[in-house]
């Protein structure tokens, strides 16, 4: 019986200040929710081990500060990431409109590959009534960008696990594709490179 493969993945969660990034992360990693989280300064990191597609994944998830003054510093944390959660607050239109900028920041800082960089968008706080971003609008934006969209509630534990695990699955697929491509390129010999047989 083959031992289960182990893969480390770095994921990041980004978005405007106050959209609930820390709440989402703690809901996913610790299955907890608190009303009053302190503002994240810079970045904090949480880890979670899951089993997906017969692979043990160690997810290192970076929770980044959403303040404008931290944006240049936060962008350095994008490097080497395997996937990204873009979060906004469905009761805050500005946080949704800022997704374009956050997405652009990530794509500018990650190394372009043949395989697209995995992202998911989370519309958080669907438990609240004063909604400003219609579901169809968010879905339309995501469809245009070919990014999966989830309506979530960190407070009521709605769709949080599903969203993170879809991102993990996409990040794992990309990781495998890159690894396979790298190994194929490394061992591929062109006809000119192949050793010629010689008679003694």
Curated annotation (Swiss-Prot):
Report the residue ranges where the short sequence motif Switch 2 is annotated in this entry.
67-82
Q: Name one GO molecular function term.
A: GTPase activity
Keywords (alphabetical) are: Cytoplasmic vesicle, Endosome, Golgi apparatus, GTP-binding, Lipoprotein, Lysosome, Membrane, Nucleotide-binding, Phosphoprotein, Prenylation, Protein transport, Transport
Name of the gene:
RAB7B
Query: What is one Gene Ontology biological process annotated in the Swiss-Prot or TrEMBL record?
Result: negative regulation of toll-like receptor 4 signaling pathway
Q: Tell me where in or outside the cell this protein is found.
A: Late endosome; Lysosome; Golgi apparatus; Golgi apparatus, trans-Golgi network
Q: Which GO terms describe its cellular component?
A: Golgi apparatus; late endosome; lysosome; phagocytic vesicle; phagocytic vesicle membrane; trans-Golgi network
**Residues that bind GTP, according to the entry?**
15-22, 34-40, 63-67, 124-127, 154-155
This chain belongs to the protein called Ras-related protein Rab-7b
Its record classes its membrane topology as: Lipid-anchor
Q: Where is the lipid attached (S-geranylgeranyl cysteine)?
A: 199-200
Q: What is the lineage of its organism?
A: Eukaryota, Metazoa, Chordata, Craniata, Vertebrata
């Amino acid at each position: 019986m083959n031992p289960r493969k182990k893969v480390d993945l770095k994921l990041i969660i980004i978005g405007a200040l106050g959209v609930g990034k820390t709440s989402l992360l703690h809901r996913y990693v610790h299955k907890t929710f608190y009303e009053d989280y302190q503002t994240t300064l810079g970045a904090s990191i949480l880890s979670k081990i899951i089993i997906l597609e017969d692979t043990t994944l160690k997810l290192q998830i970076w929770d980044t500060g959403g303040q404008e003054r931290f944006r240049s510093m936060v962008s350095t944390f994008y490097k080497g990431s395997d996937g990204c959660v873009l979060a906004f607050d469905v009761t805050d239109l500005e946080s949704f409109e800022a997704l374009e900028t956050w997405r652009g920041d990530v794509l500018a800082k990650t190394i372009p590959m043949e395989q697209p960089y995995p992202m998911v968008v989370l519309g958080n706080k669907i438990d609240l009534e004063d909604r400003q971003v219609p579901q169809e609008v968010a879905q339309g934006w995501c469809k245009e960008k070919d990014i999966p969209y989830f309506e979530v509630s960190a407070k009521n534990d709605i769709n949080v696990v599903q969203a993170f695990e879809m991102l993990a699955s996409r990040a794992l697929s990309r990781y495998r594709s890159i690894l396979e491509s790298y190994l194929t390129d490394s061992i591929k010999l062109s006809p000119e490179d192949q050793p010629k047989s010689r008679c003694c």
